[in-house]
Amino acid sequence: MLINDVNKVKVGNIVFGGKKRFVLIAGPCVMESQELMDEVAGGIKEICDRLGIEYIFKASFDKANRSSIYSYRGPGLEEGMKMLTKIKEKFNVPVITDVHEAWQCKEVAKVADILQIPAFLCRQTDLLIAAAETGKAVNIKKGQFLAPWDMKNIVVKMEESRNKNIMLCERGSTFGYNNMVVDMRSLLEMRKFNYPVIFDVTHSVQKPGGLGTATSGDREYVYPLLRAGLAIGVDAIFAEVHPNPAEAKSDGPNMLYLKDLEEILKIAIEIDKIVKGV
């Protein structure tokens, strides 16, 4: 079980790692509008406050790896940072967003409490170094093409850049064409590096390029995977949430409905209690 102690990572008043309740990182896939972000952040925070779950808001200012050049990418860095700032100020929550190029790290770190390295870019040394040098916590998503033990080299890149505020995230592995699976052993293997482990339960059910010009997914598998990850004892759950996934501008097929989140989290808490005894 993943309840052994690890290097704890502190983000504001939130601590990742150790024998404590999981942290929730959740929000829409991409920044669609300030109104949508407010609705999601406010709704999730209310739920988490009721249930006693520590919450971090997530959203991307640029989806730089969309399947089609015609797909919506987001508002861009400058506008995106303004939108995240409003979320922080209005709801008093930490925020996380992804960076795609080294030059973005310094600017994003002025607003974001956690920088995220996308799975496709997890081996990009210059990007990792730039993120590490901000001194902020960094969530590194394991590439769909990597074995979990290959993440050790990525951890060393961060450590050698004098940043140990590291979190590692499982988001599924490529399984043939247009499909992904989750090897639950990855959660155990990555925990051996002595850093908190996050389970991205919504991207793990994607079917990359499954719609030809967009990614599809199987939302029905999010729930059992979530329960399985918590049974292992992960430090945090990462999930994309939307009021109406069918109308989402990115990743709709694998996103959770905001209206369903509270009941899902109630079950999650019970599993977490059994596993961690907290």
From Swiss-Prot:
Keywords from the named record: Cytoplasm, Lipopolysaccharide biosynthesis, Transferase
InterPro entries noted in UniProt: Aldolase_TIM (IPR013785), DAHP1/KDSA (IPR006218), KDO8P_synthase (IPR006269)
GO molecular function, one term: 3-deoxy-8-phosphooctulonate synthase activity
Pfam families, alphabetized: DAHP_synth_1
Recorded catalytic activity of this chain's protein: D-arabinose 5-phosphate + phosphoenolpyruvate + H2O = 3-deoxy-alpha-D-manno-2-octulosonate-8-phosphate + phosphate
A single GO cellular-component term on record: cytosol
Tagged with keyword Transferase: yes
Protein name: 2-dehydro-3-deoxyphosphooctonate aldolase
Organism: Fusobacterium nucleatum subsp. nucleatum (strain ATCC 25586 / DSM 15643 / BCRC 10681 / CIP 101130 / JCM 8532 / KCTC 2640 / LMG 13131 / VPI 4355)
